[in-house]
Amino acid sequence: MNTEIKVYYEDTDASERVYYANYLKFLERGRTDYLYNLGFTHKNILAKYKFYFVVKNCKIDYIKPAYFEDILKITTEVINISKVKIFFHQHIKKNEELFV
């Protein structure tokens, strides 16, 4: 599943590069869109199943910086599901070039 995100000025630091922590927000949007695409929202999962998602572990390799006004593509894939865990693999690209 892919999500497109435009980098806004608020996402950047003084050099107009995406501030490193903001990539986590972009990845969260990708996971949320993944669930929406399956017909779920965080609110209906909590109401119906009485649970919510927490991020226990996250590893990021910063390969190349993104800049103000870039259009990024976040790809989200589920790689493993158990009764209590979902493992996602995500990456961020611009024009098919890997950034994160």
Question: How should these model regions be labeled?
Answer:
Residues 1-3, 36, 66-71, 79-100:
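HotDog/MaoC-like acyl-thioester-processing domains
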Residues 1-56:
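Hot-dog-fold acyl-thioester-processing enzymes
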Residues 11-13, 61, 70:
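Acidic side chains
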Residues 57-62, 74-75:
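Short structured motifs
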